[in-house]
Amino acid sequence: MTQNVNHQLLDRELAADDPWRLDGNPFERKRHTQMLQLALAQGSITNALEVGCAAGAFTEKLVPYCQGLTVIDVVAQAIARARQRIKEPSRINWIVCDVQQFSTDELFDVIVVAEVLYYLGDIAEMRAAIKNLVRVLAPGGHLIFGSARDANCRRWGHAAGAEPVIAMLNETLIEVERLECRGESVNEDCLLVRFRNPISAS
């Protein structure tokens, strides 16, 4: 599936009242609860990065626990919808950009990247995105990854899902905790993993 087709799919979904049913679906609420549990495993968050905000459903849950939060999304409409939703904009730095091109001198003690990487065109782009995220993960920081399983992602026309990306992340980070989230539908089946940067703070 090409990047243009993926962007068209994202635009179409974001036009809905409840994109991806993130607010109304019990599975999505459970997934967000588990993501937040993983993100807060080390306590309060100094500086977080959320990659891909959809319409801000998880951003709204995460921001109260962050001293600072940067949110990036390749789709301007996603950022616009999330900004309308969030009541504490002063804590959030909103950036429209691709995860592969994201550039900053900041380091983040928590990075959340869920249901995002399978929208990239191929494995090489996923590797580039992972390399970029690891670059901005603070020493000892945690990266929270979530994705539908590989079989579902491939059936949907994506290059890869959870299992191959988890293997790539394990090449440079240390897997600390893994959760499974399942709903009633065969499509509602994802893995959520917390990784730690093995480089210690000096």
Predicted regions mapped to residue ranges:
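Class I (Rossmann-like) S-adenosyl-L-methionine-dependent methyltransferase catalytic domain
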Residues: M1-G43, N47-S103, L120-N132, H142-S202
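A short SAM/SAH-binding and catalytic strip from SAM-dependent methyltransferases
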Residues: V110-A124
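A short acidic, Gly/Pro-enriched loop at the edge of an enzyme's catalytic core
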Residues: S103-I111
